[in-house]
């Protein structure tokens, strides 16, 4: 009995996911793995640059 419920929940979850994709809410999923990796690396580089600037500002103040 539990498996039937589990299947139904999985079906509903999958249906919701496909509806979101068709509505265009999940645009990030349309990226390939390499594109996503490139985008994420750029974001992390920007964050690291900001963190380094904050760190250097704190050391110059002391």
Swiss-Prot record:
Pfam family, one: SERF-like_N
Expression tissues: Expressed in brain (at protein level). Highly expressed in the testis.
Task of the protein: Positive regulator of amyloid protein aggregation and proteotoxicity. Induces conformational changes in amyloid proteins, such as APP, HTT, and SNCA, driving them into compact formations preceding the formation of aggregates.
Quaternary organization: Interacts with SNCA; this interaction promotes the aggregation of SNCA.
Upper classification of the organism: Eukaryota, Metazoa, Chordata, Craniata, Vertebrata
Keywords: Cytoplasm, Nucleus
Protein name: Small EDRK-rich factor 1
Main location: cytoplasm
Gene Ontology biological-process annotations: amyloid fibril formation; protein destabilization
InterPro entries xrefs: SERF-like_N, SERF1/2-like
Comp. bias (Basic and acidic residues): 1-30, 50-62
Gene from which this protein is expressed: Serf1
GO cellular component: cytosol; nucleus; protein-containing complex
Family designation: Belongs to the SERF family.
Cell location: Cytoplasm, Cytosol; Nucleus
Spans annotated as Disordered: 1-62
């Amino acid at each position: 009995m539990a498996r039937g419920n589990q299947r139904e929940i999985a079906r509903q979850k999958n249906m919701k996911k496909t509806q979101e994709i068709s509505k265009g809410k999940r645009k990030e999923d349309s990226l390939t793995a390499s594109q996503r990796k490139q985008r994420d690396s750029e974001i992390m580089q920007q964050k690291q640059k900001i963190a380094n600037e904050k760190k250097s500002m704190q050391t110059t103040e002391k």
